């Protein structure tokens, strides 16, 4: 089968959950003998090769561009440029493909592929990691820009397609947008260690691992750890990640007097992240917007429970079984989150053992392989 994967980023040149998903999908497809083209924006130096299995044909549909503003929000120009590049590529080569599989975001590539689908004869498969609410669109882009964004998202939903979501939250929202086609919820994005780690005695460390963008609410996490540290002797915080909110993180550490308690180490490699997850008392997820919440599963694989903040745009709460593999902080304030951290401390080894059992019991459902299998089946329907 001839498959064209469409996403403006490619792992590891850009790091994120969707990036890993499309890279894993591409490499699984070529391993199974399929012909794969990965259509993306160039993220590597001119003249260099993209870092991916050499059997995957990588095609640049646009130049190297900064995708984010200084504040951490997506720039408007790159999606437009990429959308035009996708349209031109499919206009030339669309008949070569049996399937075009794209991410819904950043929307314009999907809108570019839509009118060519009946002309070129390819099937269109779309991943919806998130479906933004009206209130979030307006907060993100303002009243006028938010309304335009909302209409663009709705137009994408009305395109005939085979859709996949990664949470019930966003599948429900997609149906409410009157999706033009079937939608399946994929539960598995985890491609790490297959055997659950034996839970070890935790150090009194709260771990935060994420790209430092406004949606992750890093200063709220610092304030919560400050309150929890007043109730848990020897508690420390470890922040792994970089991004536009780094200066705000450093300032919050000083503001709360946590210089000797909280460490911001920046980007961490896979081995460092693994070691920190294994020793942490809990993983802290203060994000107000998540399409899945893979870090919850990654922590659970090491026997580490998670504290997740409730929110109307946060699908990571679907991965938490209260008191089994973590807890949900019901309100976006330091007191509520600190209380959740204290609950994890008081649960001690019992919560680590139940987290390991939860992961073992759900591994098949949460595995990347389970989702890849369903996607491959959809290509033939």
Task: State each model region's role.
Residues 91, 115-119, 126, 132, ...:
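Membrane-proximal helix-turn-helix segments that form the acceptor-binding/catalytic region
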Residues 248-268:
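Nucleotide-activated donor-binding/catalytic signature segment of Leloir-type glycosyltransferases, i.e.
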Residues 288:
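Aromatic "clamp/platform" in nucleotide-sugar-dependent glycosyltransferases that forms part
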Residues 346-380:
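A charged, aromatic-enriched C-terminal amphipathic alpha-helix characteristic of glycosyltransferases
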Residues 321-334, 342-348:
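Conserved acidic donor-binding segment of nucleotide-sugar-dependent glycosyltransferases
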Residues 267-268, 275-280:
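Short alpha-helical donor nucleotide-sugar binding micro-motif in glycosyltransferases
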Residues 169, 188-189:
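Carbohydrate-associated surface elements
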